[in-house]
Swiss-Prot record:
Listed name of the protein: SUZ RNA-binding domain-containing
Superkingdom of origin organism: Eukaryota
Domain (SUZ-C): residue spans on this chain: 111-152
Domain SUZ: from-to ranges: 42-107
Lineage: Eukaryota, Metazoa, Chordata, Craniata, Vertebrata
Length: 152
């Protein structure tokens, strides 16, 4: 590369034929490489013959799984902490206490007995005020002409 002259611009290089020479060199190199890569790989291929034993068959061992998802533990220890079982009366008492604390009333029956007056009643419109669904429009132009119906 030291003996090659560097052109001032690509136009000078094209005029002198330098670009063509470089392209030809690269093309020859790639053709040589492609010829080398087309040859089949030289890997030894072993052909098995039935007359020669291939060796002992692979050993298969059946392993036992641990009792609890891969974790070996004592049978005395449990995975979940034991919570005391509450009776229905205890659960209802806790629910009433929490409801009183949050909502201010102890039982849902108290609220159902009161009529709900806060909700506005729905006012229905009479049928004659409503607009018909089959509205037919007849467009007019800006100057009062027939609009789209105008023929030319």
């Amino acid at each position: 590369m030291e003996d090659e002259e560097v052109a001032e611009s690509w136009e000078e290089a094209a005029d002198s034929g330098e670009i063509d020479r470089r392209l030809e060199k690269k093309l020859k190199i790639t053709q040589k490489e492609s010829r080398k890569s087309k040859s089949p790989p030289k890997v030894p291929i072993v052909i098995q013959d039935d007359s020669v034993p291939s060796g002992p068959p692979p050993q298969i061992r059946i392993l036992k799984r641990p009792a609890t998802n891969g974790v070996l533990s004592n049978p005395n220890s449990t995975t979940r902490p034991a919570f005391p079982v509450k009776s229905l009366a205890q659960r209802e008492a806790e629910y009433a206490e929490a409801r009183k604390r949050i909502l201010g009333s102890a039982s849902p029956e108290e609220e159902q007995e009161k009529p709900i007056l806060d909700r506005p009643t729905r006012i229905s419109q009479p049928e004659d005020i409503r607009q018909p669904n089959n509205v037919i429009r007849q467009p007019l132009g800006p100057d009062g002409s027939q609009g789209f119906k105008q023929r030319r």
